[in-house]
Regions:
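Conserved Radical SAM active-site core
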Residues: 60-185, 189-199, 203-207
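Glycine-rich, proline-tolerant flexible connector loops at the mouths of alpha/beta enzymes
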Residues: 34-41, 61-64, 91-104, 155-156, ...
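Auxiliary Fe-S-binding modules of radical SAM enzymes
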Residues: 1-23, 77, 83, 205-306
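Residue-level signature of catalytic and energy-coupling elements of molecular machines
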Residues: 18, 51, 147
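Hydrophobic faces of well-ordered beta-strands that scaffold small-molecule active sites
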Residues: 34-41, 90, 122-124, 145-147, ...
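Conserved short loop/turn motifs at secondary-structure junctions
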Residues: 39-42, 96-97, 126, 188-190, ...
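N-terminal pre-triad scaffold of radical SAM enzymes
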Residues: 21, 27-60, 67-91, 212
Length: 306
């Protein structure tokens, strides 16, 4: 499907149009099937970066559980469990700006484990990559790499000072250079303006990811954004999702962390009109819904599980 290549003004006008009309427009790009994926937090905490939303940053006293890289048997067990829940894609996620050199060979062995489970597609989220790392991941058969932009370029300095928006985009380009699929999304509700949400949609359209994970901020105590409970409401979440889908018709919009900030009714509405994927189970440092509830919701909507 050819991208519409709408201008910022056109997307903003869509954002501010009647909600029913907006959702009707976005629904034209939605398939009748929903993808399920899942993750394992394979290394937790002690991250050197100062992302203001993140429980895993060593800059904040968030009291989360920290641990080194999981071994192969633990990852394989988690992937097989995710498969029983209906996931067809599974990702290893590690904390930190990028993979530590001494850990990278272990990470590659985890990719091999992911690829060994029949019927599952491998994914990894390891932070910022250099050329050699991206090449090695591709050589080991990694199907998809996840790396969010998190917000738009103009707002990025407000959420992080230890790396740049451009560093993130560079990693996205490396992923595509070496033939891997790209999963690249955002976190909504971090204080961005409506105009900046439009910028996110347009910047993602330039990157052209295969999947766009949509996270909604779940404020973590002891982080700088701990009081950001009211930066986006349910209607504006729906409006943002619709505009993202219209601007990125070929990408699968995916519900990820924080979607419980939407009512069950609005989660269903989003799945009808703009969202085609769900991360099932728990997230990195927050709790998700029971997979059985998500399966039931999708079936009630008359959609197939991919």
């Amino acid at each position: 499907m050819e991208s519409l290549k709408l201008s910022k003004k056109e997307l903003l006008n869509l954002y501010n149009s009647e909600l029913d009309e907006l959702l009707e427009k976005s629904s034209k790009f939605v398939k009748d099937e929903v993808e399920f994926c899942s993750i394992v937090n394979a290394r937790s905490g002690k991250c050197s970066q100062d992302c203001k939303y993140c429980a895993q940053s060593s800059h904040y006293r968030t009291h989360i559980e920290t641990y080194p890289l999981l071994d192969k048997s633990e990852v394989e067990k988690a992937e097989k469990e995710a498969k029983t829940f209906g996931a067809h894609r599974f990702a290893v996620v590690t904390s930190g700006k990028n993979p530590a050199e001494e850990d990278f060979h272990k990470v590659l062995s985890l990719v091999d484990v992911l690829n060994s489970v029949e019927g599952m597609n491998s994914c990894a989220s390891l932070g910022i990559l250099d050329d050699e790392m991206a090449k090695k991941l591709s050589e080991h058969g990694l199907k998809r790499y996840h790396h969010n932009i998190n917000t738009c370029r103009s707002y990025y300095p407000e959420i992080c000072s230890t790396h740049t928006f451009d560093e993130r985009v560079k990693t996205c380009k490396l992923v595509k250079k070496y033939g891997m699929e790209l999963c690249c999304g955002v976190i909504l509700g971090m204080g961005e303006t409506v105009e900046q949400r439009i910028e996110m949609a347009m910047e993602l359209a330039e990157i052209e990811p295969d999947s766009i994970p949509i996270n909604i901020l779940m404020p973590i105590p002891e982080t700088p954004f701990e009081k950001y409970h009211d930066k986006i409401d349910e209607e504006n979440i729906l409006r943002t999702l619709a505009v993202f889908k219209i601007a990125n018709p070929n990408a699968v919009l995916r519900f990820c962390g924080g979607r419980m900030r939407l009512s069950d009714e609005n989660q269903r509405l989003a799945l009808k009109t703009c969202v085609e994927g769900i991360m099932i189970g728990n997230y990195l440092t927050t709790i998700g819904k029971e997979p059985s509830e998500d399966i039931a919701m999708v079936k009630e909507l008359g959609k197939k599980i991919k």
